[in-house]
């Protein structure tokens, strides 16, 4: 019974997160909400920091596309799937908001880690080196 309630709760959470999202909109979420979202294998994980930052450490299973790269949008289009939500982050939340705006304008469903990778690390969440 608890598992059914948990599954129903997760489904409700996802549907409320994406149902009202329009082109150009994205959601900024807390570390805990981001962690819950990326547990879903359908969610694409995107690190928009520099290659050097990504190489130091990152959230497991994240791909890296530097938002400061002039061809960010083109690389994203050739790498990401528009039919699957994108959960993205940067170091502190500034660059990820820029990336989220770009991708959501292109029609992607975007969730952004509001306080970035720094908050993720501070919360003791899993990272890869």
Residue ranges and their predicted role:
Residues 2-10, 17-37, 52-85, 94-129:
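Rhodanese-like catalytic fold shared by cysteine-dependent sulfurtransferases
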Residues 37-43:
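Start-of-domain marker
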Residues 44-49:
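Short hydrophobic beta-strand that contains or immediately precedes a catalytic carboxylate
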Residues 89:
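Short, surface-exposed ligand- or partner-binding patches at beta-edge/loop junctions that are enriched
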């Amino acid at each position: 019974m608890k598992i059914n309630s948990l599954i129903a709760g997760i489904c409700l959470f996802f549907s409320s997160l994406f149902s009202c999202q329009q082109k150009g909109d994205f959601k900024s979420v807390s570390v805990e909400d981001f962690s819950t979202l990326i547990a879903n294998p359908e969610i694409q994980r995107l690190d928009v920091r520099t290659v050097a930052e990504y190489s130091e450490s990152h959230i497991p299973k994240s791909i890296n596309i530097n938002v400061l790269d002039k061809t960010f949008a083109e690389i994203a289009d050739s790498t990401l799937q528009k039919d699957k939500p994108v959960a993205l982050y940067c170091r502190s939340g500034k660059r990820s908001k820029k990336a989220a705006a770009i991708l959501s304008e292109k029609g992607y469903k975007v969730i952004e880690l509001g306080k970035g990778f720094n908050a993720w690390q501070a919360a003791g969440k899993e990272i890869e080196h």
